[in-house]
UniProtKB/Swiss-Prot annotation:
Record protein name field: Trimethyllysine dioxygenase, mitochondrial
Subunit structure: Homodimer.
Catalysed conversion reaction: N(6),N(6),N(6)-trimethyl-L-lysine + 2-oxoglutarate + O2 = (3S)-3-hydroxy-N(6),N(6),N(6)-trimethyl-L-lysine + succinate + CO2
Record PANTHER family: GAMMA-BUTYROBETAINE HYDROXYLASE-RELATED (PTHR10696), TRIMETHYLLYSINE DIOXYGENASE, MITOCHONDRIAL (PTHR10696:SF51)
Pathway involvement of the protein, from the record: Amine and polyamine biosynthesis; carnitine biosynthesis
Species for this entry: Bos taurus
CDD domains: CAS_like
Cross-referenced NCBIfam families: carnitine_TMLD
Main location, first listed in the record: mitochondrion
Localization per Swiss-Prot or TrEMBL: Mitochondrion matrix
InterPro entries: AlphaKG_dependent_hydroxylases (IPR050411), GBBH-like_N (IPR010376), GBBH-like_N_sf (IPR038492), TauD-like_sf (IPR042098), TauD/TfdA-like (IPR003819), Trimethyllysine_dOase (IPR012776)
GO biological process, one term: carnitine biosynthetic process
Cofactor note: Binds 1 Fe(2+) ion per subunit.
Lineage of origin: Eukaryota, Metazoa, Chordata, Craniata, Vertebrata
Amino acid sequence: MWCHRLSHLQSRLQDLLRGRVTRWALQQSNFKSLFPLAIYWHHTASKSLNCVWQQHEDHFELQYANNVMRFDYVWLRDHCRSASCYNSKTHQRSLDTASVDLCIQPQTIHLDETTLFFTWPDGHVTRYDLDWLMKNSYEGQKQKVIQPRILWNAEIYQQAQVPAVDFQTFLETKEGLKNFLQNFLLYGIAFVENVPPTQKHTEKLAERISLIRETIYGRMWFFTSDFSRGDTAYTKLALDRHTDTTYFQEPCGIQVFHCLKHEGTGGRTLLVDGFYAAEQVLQKAPEEFELLSKVPLKHEYIENVGECQNHMIGVGPVLNIYPWNKELYLIRYNNYDRAVINTVPYDVVHRWYTAHRTLTRELRRPENEFWVKLKPGKVLFIDNWRVLHGRESFTGYRQLCGCYLTRDDVLNTARLLGLQA
């Protein structure tokens, strides 16, 4: 009896694999005794498209353009782009997701040219272009980066000879703005030259690409070494490499620097590509990279100078990555503002110190340091989520102005110009 049933099952499977059966429902009583759950298989192939799909009990599997993708049925119903489910004018969902049966399955599926049609139990039809599914599948997104970047050390950046953009070209032409943003997105830093050395013109420059992010330091900040704020930046001391506002829950995205005047020596700006250093850690000690991406740390800013009373706390790991493609998108590194480590047990702490030391060594390698002397008329934009900055000590009177920009608005401007961001 068992031999007969298994032989029959094997025969039916061979028929399916030869393409003789396009729909096979294992619902007969003799099969139910072999399998506790009914299994539905749908198999359609298009040689011209190299497309194969199968309908499983709990998901839809698609093989297309050398990719194997799997889609949950609720997901397929939820992302329907029909007129009743999606407003194409506002690009917003109209369907009430909570109304979708969590056990929903399509009644029929068929392929017409490059479009898949799903007919649901209530008769509603959802259609998907194969390329749209590939682009928006988890498997497709896992292979893509959100923002292409060129990682650099001092030699790589200098050999690239990335040009600065002229002030007037930046303000008056889309091409100048696009070239600037392309350089900024790729390298995490970019320069604008021939800027009148005033706070007003620096502000005008910043507003060309983004809203200015007002913080506890104001909208546009102007500082010298008078220690008017409770921060080491307001001194003549050297500053080690760091990212700013790690004590914000969302650190400021972009920083703008313009040296309006310097009557003295020293004061060069240090720039280090934090993503380049992190990549070295990933290659040499992947387990330490992973630890730095998982251990949450507190950063703190306490100020009690004159009328400036602030107590800011931000929490997050040193390295922040997207979970689906492991792409690094933010480094939160500031040894000045790191608070007490009390967010992990003792047996993790020492491993974290070891990993942090590995990253610090990479960040401090002389070959990774790019030094630049900021002068009146030359404005520097820094991706504060990627590039660390510091400075050497200086003498004499030095005036700087600048601001922070909202990251979302900078990326918005870039996308509207056709850049990937």
